Amino acid sequence: MTLIWIPLIPLMVKIVMKLVPDGKEMGAKALENPNYLDNKLIAQPAAALQLVAKEVMYCAKIVDEMIGKLQSGNGKIDKENAGIVEEKAKILQKLYASINDYFAALYSGGVLTEEQASQSAGMQSILCDIDRIGQLTREIMETVAKQNKGKHKYSKEALKELKKAMEQIQMIYGSCIRAISGNVDMDIKELMRQKEDIMQLDEKMRKNHIARVGK
């Protein structure tokens, strides 16, 4: 996560996301369209950047849901969850493109102050990280699903390790997103400790995989 940008994004502080009004489900086509961006506000960068911040946080929520789908069934990827992850990944890509187009319109308008340009760069960096996490999540889903359909399936131990890893990743990801949205203060030291735990787990998983393959 791009933590260094957090102090530069006051517009993202205390944003309260409400994804689906009244708890009603939205169709896939509606979800692919930006929920907050308004081209009529391009000439008003302060208001426009607030809308961008909300849209970025909406993308963050989508990725959080994608990661959560990789934790069900002790790491096994069933057809339903695979479809959900794939659908959300496509929605994320379209929103990512829409937000970047909106940024381009803001920049070309020549209305951003130096501070607003810095804030925009910070939000773009965070959006890029969120999109990358989402696409990597889809790749994990595709890899596991494909492997489990083949002759050499992942062992139960490997799938349990994957589930544990995704739980830890979702925890650290959630902490970052809550801090960016202004809901909690970020403990950088604790965040780095969690990151180190994930790195150690990654090393352990690799060693265990090699040991299992070598049997």
Regions found by a protein language model. Give the residues of each.
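Cytosolic, long alpha-helical scaffolding segments
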Residues: 4, 8-215
